[in-house]
């Protein structure tokens, strides 16, 4: 079914307008000409290259077969005025068989460059990619504004996965599930078939994500899971088994820890690092792993896929090639990689070492 087959009732449209969805409603308006038929979502995306390009796994209970390597919305995709680099990376990813693209309403600052670049490709290749975005807002109304703008920038009338971004503390969870909280927006948009599935994401502490999972049966979880994880505030110990038990789609991120786990990473000068987000934990030396080791560690965990941002087409092609060649590591190999990651685990998990409310 094509996107043009979508229809929406006038009641649905009125409700979405109440939520501040004027722009999105305008995008859907042509379908109103078909009358009072119920809006339906198109079939799941399908990239015909994926099964030949890399192994696939079930994305939880969503019914989607996702390639084990997926494209993250940061790196080149979040840089300002970087269309000539970012858009070809996205196009090439789809050509290579990537069938899941991650982005967020906060990637690229107020201009939301990441969603802009992804949208330029989705305008003509929407049916080939499972499209995921996020809201970091904690209220219903602010999240409604976020999804409205996301749809506009992504040049689509629906997203396959809408996620609560960076759920780090119980304070976040309580805000999200409070009356007027962001969870209301997620449920409304799913009911109105503006979003297909719901998820949550996090990289700070496992307890908050576990509490979120207990409060609502989310379809997916996007969690930081690299070879440094077992050494500091581990997500592997309790969060990962809970997500597996709930049969969630599990998406791994922060695989190379912004490069800091990798032996070929060149540290920036310390004074430069201090001005960066990563600078909350300084990294004076390179890492200890190859990209193959870092990637295969996470893919040997019970994940559906991993998202990795790429700075160049060459980097993208290397990652897809590694995914194509993947075979699971033995327990002994996993233990050896974890042990070698220990000296650089804290810099590779820098996102777990800053103050949160």
Region spans (language model):
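N-terminal secretory signal peptides
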Residues: 1-12
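Glycine/proline-rich, positively charged
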Residues: 138-227, 231-234, 238, 244-251
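Glycine-rich, proline-tolerant flexible connector loops at the mouths of alpha/beta enzymes
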Residues: 102-120, 170-171
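Conserved, mostly hydrophobic/aromatic
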Residues: 59, 71, 101, 118, ...
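N-terminal twin-arginine translocation
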Residues: 10-15, 25-46
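Alpha-helix-loop-beta-strand connector modules within alpha/beta enzyme cores
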Residues: 115-132, 184-188
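Structured C-terminal cap/extension of enzyme domains
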Residues: 237-357
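N-terminal amphipathic alpha-helix/helix-capping segment at the start of soluble metabolic enzymes
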Residues: 41-70
């Amino acid at each position: 079914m094509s996107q043009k087959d979508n229809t929406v009732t006038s009641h649905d449209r009125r409700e979405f307008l109440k939520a501040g969805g004027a722009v999105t409603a305008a995008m859907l308006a042509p379908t109103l000409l078909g009358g009072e038929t119920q809006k339906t979502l198109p079939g799941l995306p399908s990239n015909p290259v994926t099964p030949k390009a890399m192994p696939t796994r079930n994305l939880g209970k969503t019914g989607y077969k996702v390639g084990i390597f997926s494209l993250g919305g940061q790196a080149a995709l979040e840089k300002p005025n970087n269309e000539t680099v970012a858009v070809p990376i996205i196009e090439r990813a789809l050509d290579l068989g990537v069938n899941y693209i991650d982005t967020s309403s906060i990637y690229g600052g107020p201009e939301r460059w990441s969603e802009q670049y992804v949208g330029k490709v989705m305008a003509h290749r929407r049916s080939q990619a499972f499209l995921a975005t996020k809201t970091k807002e904690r209220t219903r109304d602010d999240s409604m504004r976020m999804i409205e703008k996301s749809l506009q920038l992504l040049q689509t009338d629906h997203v396959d996965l809408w996620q609560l971004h960076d759920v780090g503390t119980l304070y976040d969870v309580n805000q999200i599930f409070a009356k007027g909280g962001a969870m209301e927006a997620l449920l409304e948009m799913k009911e109105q078939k503006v979003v297909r599935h719901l998820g949550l994401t996090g990289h700070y502490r496992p307890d908050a994500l576990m509490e979120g999972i207990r409060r609502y049966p989310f379809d997916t979880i996007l969690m930081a899971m690299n070879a440094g994880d077992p050494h500091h505030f581990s997500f592997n110990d309790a969060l990962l088994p809970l997500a597996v038990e709930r049969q969630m789609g599990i998406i791994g991120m922060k695989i190379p820890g912004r490069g800091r786990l990798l032996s070929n990473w060149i540290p920036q000068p310390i004074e430069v690092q201090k001005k960066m987000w990563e600078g909350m934990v300084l990294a004076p030396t390179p890492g200890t792993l190859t990209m193959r080791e870092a990637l295969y560690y996470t893919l040997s965990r019970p994940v559906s896929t991993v998202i990795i941002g790429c700075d160049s087409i060459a980097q993208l092609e290397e990652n897809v090639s590694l995914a194509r060649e993947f075979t699971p590591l033995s327990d002994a190999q996993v233990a050896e990689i974890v042990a070698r990651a220990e000296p650089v685990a804290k810099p590779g998990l820098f996102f777990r070492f800053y103050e949160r409310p």
